[in-house]
Amino acid sequence: MLYNIININILNSNILLDIISILSIISSIAIILVSNPMYSILYLIILFINIAIYLYLIGISIMSLLYILVYIGAIAVLFLFILSLFTALPYLLESKNLKITELNNTFLHKNNNIPLFILIIIIFYYNMINYFNNIYLNNNNINNNNINNLDNINNILLNNDWYKIFDINHLNQIGFLLYTEYSILLIFISFLLLFSILSAIVLTHNK
């Protein structure tokens, strides 16, 4: 019974990871093919969200949090702010409204993007073949060699002190390294973000 429940959970988790991976690939392709920079940045944010969810599901929660804070919270929002001032506002004033058909016309109607799109499809197809081959080999190895080990999984779950495994806090370790060994880099990155915000304000004021 426990073996069947674990298999169902693993299968559902793998399906969810596959869906997130496919959405990430679609978002990355849309970033390249969309000509409007505003839509490109929006697809970039969607890509970062998918990557953060993927990292959280595989157990790397700290990297997922960093993706949301750094990429989505700082870089993507800053790009959206700048692009909205210098590109989206004149575009809105000229066209009066955003036409949804223009978003559809940007896909596969740009001749210069078709070779790049074909190259991405070939790379994606090659990686998917290797991915499914590895899954098939891993499933065969599990079915042939590890059935006896899975019979004792109930004893493993009940007899181990799991709180000792999670006793180490990754967030505390990263914070300690950032403020001690890599403090100069942290200050340098802070100044870069400060200068980027100030430059955006100055350019907006001059405009």
UniProtKB/Swiss-Prot annotation:
**Keywords of this protein's UniProt record, alphabetized?**
Electron transport, Membrane, Mitochondrion, NAD, Respiratory chain, Translocase, Transmembrane, Transmembrane helix, Transport, Ubiquinone
Q: What is its EC number?
A: 7.1.1.2
- Classify the main location: mitochondrion
- What InterPro entries does the record point to? NADH_UbQ/plastoQ_OxRdtase_su6, Nuo/plastoQ_OxRdtase_6_NuoJ
Would the keyword Electron transport turn up in this protein's UniProt record?
yes
Top-level taxonomic group: Eukaryota
Top EC class, one word:
translocase
Q: Which cysteines are joined by disulfide bonds?
A: none
Compartment list: Mitochondrion membrane
What is the reaction catalyzed? Answer: a ubiquinone + NADH + 5 H(+)(in) = a ubiquinol + NAD(+) + 4 H(+)(out)
Record membrane topology:
Multi-pass membrane protein
What parts of the sequence cross the membrane?
15-35, 40-60, 66-86, 116-136, 184-204
For this UniProt entry, the molecular function terms from Gene Ontology, in alphabetical order, are: NADH dehydrogenase (ubiquinone) activity
Pfam families found in the cross-reference section: Oxidored_q3 (PF00499)
Quote the cellular component terms of the Gene Ontology held in the record. Answer: mitochondrial membrane
Q: Which protein family is named in the record?
A: Belongs to the complex I subunit 6 family.
Which function does this protein serve? Core subunit of the mitochondrial membrane respiratory chain NADH dehydrogenase (Complex I) that is believed to belong to the minimal assembly required for catalysis. Complex I functions in the transfer of electrons from NADH to the respiratory chain. The immediate electron acceptor for the enzyme is believed to be ubiquinone.
Q: What is this protein called?
A: NADH-ubiquinone oxidoreductase chain 6
Q: What species does this protein belong to?
A: Wickerhamomyces canadensis (Yeast)
